[in-house]
Amino acid sequence: MTFDDITGDGRLWAVRYDDANDNELFRLFDQWNDVMWLRKFFKENINDLNAYFKITDINQAISDTIDDSEVLEGVILDISPEADLDLIFRPLSNNRTIAEMLEKMKARGERTNRHDSWLRIYAIRLADGKYIITGGAIKLTATMQERPHTQAELDKIEKVRRFLLDEGIVDDDGFIDYISEL
């Protein structure tokens, strides 16, 4: 795996997995704007969409996803040097009590007038205001373990965390040293 510097200043990175054509952030935004991919996804997950969000119209779900993706993409990619990424990313676990080394984090789209956002971007926190994006998903259930596509995102974030630890990377300084040696 390699890492792409999204902001150009080392504050936001995205994983590019060995078998991937692009990094995870750009892959997600491409996917969340692909009507055919979204139609297939929502057809396969219509029961979850209805159970949690009370939406049965796949076209509405597609439209909401594309709209929400554009807003989230603007927030993530239009980050000014003064912007605080800690306001965008939150701990993955809603029950976290203390910060941990290489903490698992999430960013989500904003609530619309119709419903909460189901878009998630997952990341690892290197230090205050510095993150590595590991993936993302359309989350239609209460927990990530309930569906294979969100469980896969948990697996990816843990895989990246393990990779960093195996390379002796426990913070931003270690990550920058690692990147500079490549």
Task: For the regions a language model picked out, list residue spans one by one.
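An acidic, glycine-rich, mixed-charge low-complexity segment common to nucleic-acid enzymes
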Residues: M1-I76, A83-G109, I169, F175-I176, ...
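Residue-level signature for short turns and capping positions that connect secondary-structure elements
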Residues: A20, I138-K139
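Short Gly/Pro-enriched turn/cap motifs at secondary-structure boundaries
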Residues: R111-N113
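Short, surface-exposed coil-to-beta transition loops
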Residues: D116-I121
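A recognition module on extended beta-rich or small alphabeta surfaces enriched in W/G with H and D/E
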Residues: T141-E181
